[in-house]
Structure formats: C-alpha cells, structure tokens
Amino acid sequence: AIVTIPAGEKSVDFEIISNKKGVVADKVQLEIGVKYPLPEADMGRVEEVLRVVVKPYMEAEDLTEEQQALLEGYKAKGLDLSKWIGVIPVKVSVEVPPTDGLESLINGMKKVYTGKTVITLSEDATAEQPILKMTNNPMGLTEFMYDMLRKETVENDMFWYYDPGEGEINPYMAMMELIGLSKTSLETFEMTLDNIRVDFPNNGVSNVEFLGGRPDIWDETELVTVVPFAYNYSAWNRLKELLDAGDNELAQEYVDYGATLDPTQYLFYSGIDEDYWEDGNWMEPQGVLTGNKLTFQFNFDHYSAGGYSIIRVEYTLSE
C-alpha cells in the first residue's frame, strides 16, 4: 500500500485497521518507510523505518469441568468470577520518573495504554481460595514492559554501543551479533501472571493479592517482592540456550560481563512492598474487585531507574 504526502506538506495521517477476517494466525511485522525521491532540502533524509507488529485476535481459554464447578461454588458464596473469565478490556496509566541513565527517559514518560487481557481460572485455584491467571497481556502491560526492556538493552545507545577501542571487544555488541539480535530483528515478547488471589467479598468488596517473590539479582538466596510476571522473550531464549548448553565460552563471558537479555535483570529491579527508593513515589500495592471494576495500583522500577514508576490498572466490564 502507498500513502501519498500532499505537495507542500511534511506529514500525513493514516490508520492501520483490522479487516476482522481473522486470517492472522501468528504475529506479523509490517514495515512502513519513505519512498524516495523527496525534497531533502525541505524534509531532510528520513532513514527510520516504522515497524508495526500485527497480532492475532485474543481468544478466551476453555475451562475444564472442574474449573466450571469451582466458579459455581464461588458464586454460591457471593463471588461471581465467571464474568471475569475471558477477554477483558483494560486501561493502564504509567508514570516513569526522569532517568539520567537512559537518554530515552531523560525527561521521564507518562503514557496511557488501552488493550485487552485474557483472564482464566488458575490451575492452582481451590474451593477455599479463588485464584485467577492472566495468560495474555497481563495487567495490560506487555507493550510497556517490552518497551522498557528494549530501552535498557538493544536500544540503549548510551551504554550498549560504545567504541571499545583498538583490540578490545564490546561485550554487548558481541553478544547481539552472536545470537543475531539487532534493533530491527523481529523478536517476540510475551508475559503471563498467575496466582492472583481473590478474597470472598466483604460488603461487596474483594481484596485481591497479586504480589510474589523473585530471587534478588545480586543474591539469589534472597527474595524481592514484585509483581511476578513470567516472561518469554525470543532473544533471551536464544542466548539462554547457548548458556544452558555449556559449550559456548563466549556467551558465558559476555553474560558474566553484564551483557544479558534476561528480563528479570532489568524489570522490577527493586522490591515494591516497601519504600526502598524513598523518592516520594511509593504507594501501597493494592488490588480491589468491586462490582464491574477490577483495579490495581503498584510501583515499578528498572535497572537504570532514578526512582519508582507509578502504575494504575483498571479493568471495567460493560454494564
């Protein structure tokens, strides 16, 4: 498809929309660039290519007979979770403080994300403890988390692309070359979140617990309390495969230096159950289910962070 920029203009608006035929079975990457010639004296040379990832429609997961029976039992006790099973709309607001360690976040970032999450009943749910699991776009944060991971790694121009000098090696660039990673390579990044514990309601309000422990990156015998997302990142999978094989000394050498792609090394760098940063941004982590709303609030930080980010999540069912 071709979009024409009218004479005398420097920009044009266009939309990429679904034809709703459901023919996309897997993620597809589209590239949007500029076709030359252009009046470079007026517009400069446009080198960037915009890459858009088109994803297939989300689908709800089928429940087993046992899970359906659990839902009926919860409903009898005053907690109707059946309406929260499926593809649920979500709105997320994120406030990231200024980050001196990353050029892309030098002024911080405020952004609102809208999307959908696939929610199902966890395999660990019991009659006494309702537990939900988010299997696709948990908390509506997949796009945000992948963006932050890329900012810390493959898009980190300040620290990952330095000139090592004659006869030396930049381990970050060497690691990327080893696994075929670049700013433009097509990668996949997915998240899930299990063990979302929902209390039976008290005066129509259910408390929702969603935090969990993760090994501290500096001392794996210690746990830090975070939102325990499980990550599946294609570039890290390739690097980890080399590390697990144990026969690639270069891969291990680069990672020992710090050139890793493990999402847990960059996302939720600190615990969020206490105010470790003391920067004025900490808030009590909270999850609440009431009526047609399921809301969460919690903090987040990353490897180069200058303080806590503030995240607020709201799921709202149609009336």
Question: What is each PLM-predicted segment?
Answer:
Residues A1-T99, Y308-E319:
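Acidic/polar, low-complexity intrinsically disordered N-terminal segments immediately downstream
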Residues E61-E319:
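Ser/Thr/Gly/Pro-rich, low-complexity flexible regions
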